[in-house]
Amino acid sequence: MRELIPYFINGISVGGQYALIAIGYTLVYGILRLINFAHGDVFMVAGLVMVYTTTAMPFYLALPLVLIVTVVLGFLIERVAYKPLRTAPRMSVMISAIGVSYLIQNLAFYITGGVPQPVSNPIPWISENVAVLGTSTKRVTLVTPVLTIVLVVVLVYLINHTKIGMAMRAAAKDFETAQLMGIKINAVISMTFVIGSFLAAVGAMLYFTNYPSVAITSGGMPGLKAFVAAVFGGIGSIPGAVVGAFIIGLCEEVIKGLGYTTFSDAFTFALLIVVLCVKPTGLFGEKVTDKV
């Protein structure tokens, strides 16, 4: 059992990183009933921007720039790819999302030449090793779950106690009625993408601190697992996305600790199939009348 302690610690950290990505999926779905397939690629872009900026400028300038670039990217994706299709059939919007995903990957391929970019200048302090319960790990492993919980608390407060948050809840509850009540739907949707992109950028900086390089496909698997976490917890539910992410992160790492490393990824997608068969609404999800 003692041998599993490092895997439990890593699992909590990985779960926190998945949670930051999963919230982006669940926020967008809550309002637009859309799966933003480009969200994992936004996460990847944040990693690439971190690699380039941290080697070119001081960290106190580089890290805010990562957040700004990622947020602007998320905003532009919504305005260019989704806003013109607001009244279009949902399938058209989904196809647009897939197209945006491939566009971002190909632009990243053009910039990087398809070569993984090494994380040669990791974020100081959180990239240092520390001893925890008799095992050595990077400080980012401990920082990630704490920072995730803090950001989730701030987000929940924003949604429940601010005007923009109440507008987001109204739009999620009934999109058409919110429009008739005078809520600026376009501003609400843009803010949703901004928040999701911001959290994805934070998750990327934490995630890639533990990895030697960033490739154009680096957002694929974390994005898919975060999506599974959102579905498992109940897509559209922020607490559900967070709980689902931590459960998946812990299970994956414990499976690795038990010696079934090659099965850890398969477990996540097997879980998705089981959830969709047994409880399609997820742990905290609610039934909806509309169907895709």
Model-predicted regions and their roles:
Residues I9, I31-L76, V80, L85, ...:
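Membrane-embedded helix boundary and interhelical linker motif in transport proteins
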Residues V14, L133-V214, I238-V243:
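Helix-loop-helix "hairpin" substructures at the membrane interface of multi-pass membrane proteins
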Residues P84-L85, R90-H161, V188-M191, P212, ...:
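Transmembrane helix-bundle core of multi-pass membrane transporters
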Residues G16, Y25-G47, T87-S92, I164-A167, ...:
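Short, non-helical or kinked segments that cap or interrupt transmembrane helices
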Residues Y18-L20, M57-I68, F193-A200, L206-A270:
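Transmembrane alpha-helical segments in multi-pass inner-membrane proteins
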Residues P58-V100, L107, V243-I248, K279:
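Alpha-helical transmembrane segments within multi-pass membrane transporters and channels
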Residues G47-Y52, L67-L73, V100-A108, L147-V156, ...:
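Hydrophobic core segments of alpha-helical transmembrane domains in multi-pass membrane transport
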Residues M1-L20, V49, Y60-L61, A88-V93, ...:
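Membrane-interfacial amphipathic/re-entrant helices at transmembrane-helix boundaries
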